[in-house]
Amino acid sequence: MVMIGSAGVVAPGKWRWLRALAWLAILCVAAVAMFNLVAKAVSWLVTWAGGIAVTSASPAPPVFRLVAAIAGCIALIATYWAAVRFGEKRRVPELDLRHALSDLLLGLGIGAALLTAIVSVQWMSGWVVIEPRTVDRVAQALRDSIRSGVVEELVLRLVIFRLLWRAFGIWPAIAGAALLFGALHLANPDSSPFAAACLIAGEGIGIGLYLITGRIWSVIGMHAAWNFTQGWIFGATVSGITDIAGGPLALRPAHGIPDVLSGGGFGPEASLAALAVSLLASGALLFHALRLGRFVARDR
């Protein structure tokens, strides 16, 4: 079961819902700020140690930026652990390392399988074209995938979803987290209300995994593998961003096919195939969590 907290800043009493929301805002700012601070500091340190001059026209090598992103992710996780341990006066089972490897592998498999299913439907239907290409940019793809998996899921799942649950209950938390995730992507290149709807439909995947395991690791693995498979392996645009492409394949919309079928410039995740796969996966995982009794939280 998910532990949502019942002591410290979220202890029972007057204005508990408001205290939970204020704590949510503080954790979001602190976590993202720590990630950025440490990532930039480590990037500067490794480039300085390597004797490399970094400018806006000549950024740090991709491997150095990968190391910096991993350091930032570790700092973000540590910041969350410390804040919850002392601010909410409880242990932090959502970051239990004893199950981290198995959970990560589970999530990686689910993310890769779901994205492969989406692209397979598109390709077999003639909605996209897939061609071979020269392999490169793996370090950059790993950096972007790990960063999005850790930062987005820790903030959205462990902070926003969990504390909305604490404040208002599980159903408002599910709706609020899903709508926020979709809305945030409306600012991405080539986004649309339909693209946001597809992402909202897929939010049940991450929420379901979190409810079932009570931990964040499988959700991080799922998100990272989804992006890496979509962007690097298939060479597709990821949420309107093309930086990850560089793997063995290059995917593009077939000529004359509507964006709603191909995903257009936003990528395969903004397509009818993605909507269908995401709804099925979200429904299956949430139903399984409900059957396991995971819609009831642990306070301590």
What are these regions (language model features)?
Residues I130-S191, A201-G204, G208:
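Function-critical hydrophobic alpha-helical transmembrane segments in multi-pass membrane proteins
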Residues F86-P93, L115-I130:
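Transmembrane alpha-helix boundary signature
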Residues M1-V92, G231-R300:
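N-terminal, membrane-interfacial amphipathic/helix-forming hydrophobic leader that caps
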Residues W171-P172, I216-W217, E269:
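Residues that define the loop-to-transmembrane-helix transition and helix capping
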Residues V2-V9, V84-R85, P193-W226:
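Cytoplasmic juxtamembrane interface segments
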Residues A100, L108, A112, L142, ...:
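Residue-level signature of the transmembrane alpha-helical core
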Residues A183-A197, Q230-D243:
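Interfacial aromatic-anchored transmembrane helix boundaries in multi-pass membrane proteins
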Residues V29-N36, L115-V121, A178-A187, A225-I233:
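Aromatic-anchored segments of alpha-helical transmembrane domains
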